[in-house]
Swiss-Prot record:
A Pfam entry, by short name: YbeY
Cofactor(s) this protein cannot do without: Zn(2+)
Name of the gene encoding the protein in the UniProt record: ybeY
Record's protein name: Endoribonuclease YbeY
UniProt-recorded Gene Ontology molecular function terms: metalloendopeptidase activity; RNA endonuclease activity; zinc ion binding
UniProt entry tagged with the keyword Hydrolase: yes
Binding site for Zn(2+): H117, H121, H127
PROSITE patterns xref list: UPF0054
Coiled coil: none
Lineage, uppermost ranks: Bacteria, Pseudomonadati, Pseudomonadota, Gammaproteobacteria, Thiotrichales
Protein's cellular compartments: Cytoplasm
InterPro entries xrefs: MetalPrtase_cat_dom_sf_prd, YbeY, YbeY_CS
This protein's GO CC annotations: cytoplasm
Amino acid sequence: MDSLNLNVINDDEHPIPNQDLLEKCFALVADKHNISQAEVNVSIVSNQEIQQINKQFRHKDKPTNIISFEFEKPEGLPEDIAANFWGDIVIAPEVLKKEAKEQNKNLDDHWQHIFIHGLLHLLGYDHIDDIEAEEMENLEIELLAELGIANPYIEQEN
């Protein structure tokens, strides 16, 4: 049975785009990687919460737009348990809104870009060096084009 399960937790009811947009991004990334079964948890948090998480795990004491935590199977856990679990994503919608405004981008398009970026991190992509960054950015551009979204790395005019 094929299934993609996106668990969105938004306890404080932060403004987010229609969840269908996020599910469409999830399906697109999974399909691109020939994955038919997957699960991801997404927590929508305040700037203060993401700043605390960013400080604790990345040693950067400032809010950020998204943080991805790739699932690492604990030793001894049977292979079939959590076999399709990619990990957890934490998103700060206030940061995304500010970035979209500053970069003159459509807010829903920016959400989709950053969410795809976070999903790719869960699949092991990174941007630590220039080669990895170029590979990840090119894949993001390709996936976003399939959604009808312009290249986010080209500066938008105000």
